[in-house]
Amino acid sequence: MITNSLLHQITYGREGKNWGFSMGLPKLEEIIDGVTQSTYTLVFSPTGTGKSSIALYSYIYKPLMEHLDDGNFKVTYFSLEMSAEMLYAKLLSMYIFEKYHIELSTKELLSRKKDYILSDENYEIVKQCLPWLHKVEEIVTVYDKSLSADSMYSLLMKELEKEGTFSETEGRKIYTPNNENLIHLVVIDHLSLARRTNGRTLKEEMDLISSYLVTLRNRCKISPLVIMQANRNSTAMDRRKEGLNNLRIDDTKDTGAPAQDSEIIISIFNPHREKLSSYRGYDIKSLGSNFRVVTVLKNRYGEADVEVGCAFYGKISYFAELPKPEDIYDYEKYNNPDWILDKKEDNVKMEDDVTNIRKPKFTL
């Protein structure tokens, strides 16, 4: 049975059906193969660094735009930090930027800025986006209430029963999906906000959530995306004194189970917050808080300890890969995301390779 299953996967791959979905970050895609079926990914960073934003941009928005109408993408998003409306507003902000070339933050869309009301013109744009949002709603299901391991498992089982059939074969529970091409992304944002139940500690609850996700990944080919906080403790201070500023796998907070269970671990690092003037040749004084280092710390299927320099525009939760530092001649242009819209006018040489700041980091 295993041999037949392996042959099926090889044949399936020869048809191009094992390819991952686009993430909007080509170099990162090349390293981790994009958003793929049956892959457990952990994303972590300190608070306010952009971990939820990269999840929304690279794991949801970009695949959505590629597979809005083909029925091959589904998202179950357990949002423990923001409401479903806020999450959709962030996706809308990205869409408006790409389609209308206008930067509208979620605060502006919701008229939450003091003395600010969304203009009639921009309100009309929002209404023009409603058909797109309705399509998104068919793909992205958001649960924004409290979550425990048991409630998560129950909700996911109900969703999976709609998408396929469970059966028993030779004492094994088998799941047969209605659509073999479907990538079902399951997002936990973020894990430390899980609700403790049945006398379990927070760590035990988090570990059980991760264990359930592994079970459903193996049986039903879901793709878990777990978001966690980083814990920069006293040992991290010692590392910074030695010039080792980026995150490590053991910087995850509250539990190490997701790091062990996952195939891919990605960290987001903000050198500006650490008061660095430069990082891997990038001028942080010029880029400021618009620069992020996206690091693949673990990759069960390929290369790890690889850094990718990215521009990040928090107003619209948007990421874009930067050229190599030696190819940047005008840092000022990266202070806003307009350069992304028309790369033909870029005054730097954009190279399509995956060697962007690929230097070994942990030389302890």
Regions found by a protein language model. Give the residues of each.
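The Walker A (P-loop) glycine that initiates the GxxxxGKT/S ATP-binding motif of P-loop NTPases
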Residues: 44-45
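Helical hairpin unit composed of two closely spaced alpha helices linked by a short loop
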Residues: 76, 172-214
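Pre-Walker A (Motif I) flank of P-loop NTPase domains
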Residues: 36-41, 73
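Core recognition of P-loop NTPase motor domains used across DNA-transaction enzymes
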Residues: 1-38, 133-136, 294, 359
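Hydrophobic positions on the alpha1 helix immediately C-terminal to the Walker A/P-loop
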Residues: 54-58
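Cytosolic-facing regulatory segments adjacent to core modules
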Residues: 8, 12, 23, 30, ...
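C-terminal regions of RecA-like/P-loop NTPase motor modules
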Residues: 2, 101-103, 130-133, 150, ...
